[in-house]
Amino acid sequence: MKNINKEQIPFIIMAIVAVLWVFYFPYFSKEFLTEYFYMPFLGVIAATVANTTPAAAGIVYFPILTRLEVQPVTAVQFTLIIQAYGMGLGTFKWYLVNKRLFIFNVIPICLLGGIIGVVVSIVFFPIEKPELLTLIFNFIAFLLTQIIFFSILYEHKYPKLGIDLNTINILILFGFSLLGGLVSGWIGFGIDTMFYFILTVIFRINPAVAIVTSISLMAALSIAGTILNIIFHDVPLSIWYSALPGVTIAGLFLAAYLAVKLGPKNVLMLFTMLLSIDFFVTLWTQNTIPISYTVRSFITYALIIYLVYIHVKIFKQGFTEIGSSLGEFKADS
């Protein structure tokens, strides 16, 4: 064991997972081959998104699975269990890449608030139809993406790498984590996106550090939510099993590699694009709020024109790096 270096560990984990996946294939083969054969490919995309941006895998899984006639409650339960695994792997890989990307002192406080929120939302106040809450969350997240756009356009500085845990800061972190835990228990994701904006907007934390820390928090909270679902509700193991190959590859290898290569600016642009697309898809397909086709089309196309304008303006600005203010994902030396 002493001769194993940290570069070999992901390959060992992947080999173990591959053996176990093949071993359990007879138990899940029918569902995998007839219903969920696409999940490994979707898992690659979702896990890459979840482990490179502050948008959890649920932002990919939830709208797609519900359109494929998976019940929303089942989609939420699946989202938590696959994030517990995939973002857990991603957190471990990021720790191997550069442990200085984590703000360790805030995680216990935020995890406590998040777990309390998850317990309340899953155990005491579960909701059967999370579509409206998803729409509201996506709308708020879309509004918050404007902060990222203007921070890039005006080259805002994010000088801090840590947070002083005084009373006010603890209350802010705990309060928003509690709210994020409630949302995550209901729709399967949310605390990571919320936590990222709190770190960058309120505390001026480097985005690279904020992204990785938010990933670790969502991973830990997904584990807690999954345990609660196992105890009080159901866990869709067949869908989870089907997604494992793609999630393993992305979590252990692809996500961190892409983040390092893309850099913080491009990762943030990817993040804003994903949140925007998710909002558009949710708005266009939702039936919770009655909106006419004309109004829906006008809102969607107006927002698309606005986003195209913003992106063109950013790219015309011509800088490929935003200095050290956004931090770096590069490996720890």
Regions found by a protein language model. Give the residues of each.
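Membrane-interface helix-cap regions at the ends of transmembrane helices
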Residues: G86-R100, A220-P236, Q286-N287
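Transmembrane helix-bundle signature of multi-pass membrane transporters/permeases
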Residues: V76-M87, I211-S222, I249, L275
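Membrane-interface alpha-helices at helix entry/exit sites of multi-pass transporters
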Residues: V70-I81, L101-P108, R204-I215
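Interfacial segments of multi-pass membrane proteins
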Residues: Y61-T74, D192-V209, L228
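Short helix-coil transition sites and intra-membrane helix breaks within transmembrane domains
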Residues: T48-I59, S184-D192
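Juxtamembrane transmembrane-helix termini in multi-pass membrane transport proteins
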Residues: G58-L101
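Juxtamembrane transmembrane-helix boundary motif
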Residues: M1-I45, T66-L68, P72-V73, L96-G181, ...
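Hydrophobic transmembrane alpha-helices of secondary-active solute transporters
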Residues: A46-A50, G180-G185, L217, L221, ...
